[in-house]
Each structure stands twice: as C-alpha cells, then as structure tokens.
C-alpha cells in the first residue's frame, strides 16, 4: 500500500486503505488489465512461460479471510497463515504477476457465517483446492489471450498426476518438478507378460 501512495500523486494512505478494504469494487477487471499489460510487454516471445506457485502470509488471529493453521512454505512448517496461488508471466529476467487466487480452507467454506462476517462474496464461498485454483489461473490467462509457450510448476503441483494430465488434455506444454521418488517412463511402456517357467500358475 505504501508503494502505491508513493506513486500516486496527492494520495492518502488512509483513504487508499479504506477504498481497497471497505469500498465495493471489482478486483477482477483490474487484475485482468495487469495481465493484458504484461502480455503486451513479454507475451508471445520465445521462451515466455506462465509460472504457477503458492505463497503464504503469516497472520495472527482469525479475522483475515482464509487464515488457518496450514502449510507455510516460506517458513517450511505448519503455521497460522493465509495462502494464495499466483500466476506470473515471465521470460528470462523479466517476470510479473498476472493473477492471484486466495485459498479458502474447508473450515472457512464450511462456515457461511464466518465468511459473511469477513465479507467473502457468496460466489467465493466454495472450497477449491490449490490445484483447482491453479487451473483457474491458466484458463483465465488463455481466455484473456495471454501468450505463453508453457506452464511451469513446482513439486507441489507437479506431483499431482491428475493435474498434469489435465494440462496435457488442454494442450498445454508444461515443465514440472516432481518428487524424487516418482517413477516415470521415458517411452510408452508396452504391456508385457513374463514367460511361464513351467511351474504352477
């Protein structure tokens, strides 16, 4: 918020804070405009990728939307935090966020009164996994016409075979970290029955 106040002439921190947190405004058109501007700068170039990752923000208390005791990758442990899934368009050393989705744990979506107290819109009071949020980011980028050659994810997403298969089904090229104990085939395996050794079947 402070950086915005520094960049916007004749702005006031408290007024901006009130506008962003208490005024009724749609954030999606603003986020989509950022995606369009990023695409105009680096979209469509050879090597441009859409990176998907999550990040956690440590919190005290229980009032912030989506706050819960959950995995905080920044700290490497379970902690009271909010978690967001982010999409960034990047090529070499040029990268910028183009989308963000707040993860709502089931303890939030199973408690409509808590959601209402925190002003969570009814349309957002649905539990979606982080993998589903990642898919929403990818689909939204394609819907907006953002031009990228591939999707990049870390092991938290790359270890989900279902997620990778959904990317393949959508025709997406992807680069994914996987866990070290994941078995993979470098070529399509052919069905094989070992020969009988003459013993009992």
Predicted regions and their residues:
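Gly/serine-rich nucleotide phosphate-binding loop at the start of the catalytic core
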Residues: 1-23
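A residue-level signal for conserved active-site and pocket-lining positions in enzyme catalytic cores
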Residues: 4, 87, 174
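Hydrophobic/basic alpha-helical segments enriched in Actinobacteria
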Residues: 5, 9, 67-70, 171, ...
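Alpha-helix C-cap/termination motif
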Residues: 7, 41-44, 144, 169-170
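Electropositive, glycine- and tryptophan-enriched low-complexity nucleic-acid-binding patches
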Residues: 14-19, 74-148
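Active-site-proximal, Lys/Arg-enriched surface segment
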Residues: 21-106
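An internal, acidic/charged active-site-proximal segment
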Residues: 112-201
């Amino acid at each position: 918020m402070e950086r915005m106040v520094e960049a916007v002439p004749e702005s006031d921190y408290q007024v901006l804070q009130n506008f962003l947190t208490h005024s009724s405004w749609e954030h999606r058109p603003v986020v989509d405009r950022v995606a369009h501007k990023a695409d105009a700068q680096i979209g469509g170039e050879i090597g441009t990728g859409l990176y998907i990752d999550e990040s956690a923000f440590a919190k005290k208390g229980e009032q912030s939307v989506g706050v819960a005791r959950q995995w905080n990758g920044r700290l490497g442990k379970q902690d009271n935090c909010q978690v967001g899934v982010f999409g960034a368009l990047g090529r070499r050393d040029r990268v910028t966020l183009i989308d963000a989705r707040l993860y709502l744990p089931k303890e939030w979506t199973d408690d409509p009164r808590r959601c209402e107290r925190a002003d969570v819109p009814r349309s957002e009071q649905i539990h979606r996994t982080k993998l589903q949020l990642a898919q929403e980011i990818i689909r939204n980028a394609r819907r907006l016409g953002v031009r990228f050659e591939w999707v990049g994810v870390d092991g938290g997403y790359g270890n989900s075979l279902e997620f990778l298969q959904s990317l393949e089904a959508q025709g997406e090229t992807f680069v994914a970290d996987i866990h070290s104990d994941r078995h993979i085939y470098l070529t399509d395996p052919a069905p094989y029955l070992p020969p009988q050794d003459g013993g009992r079947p």
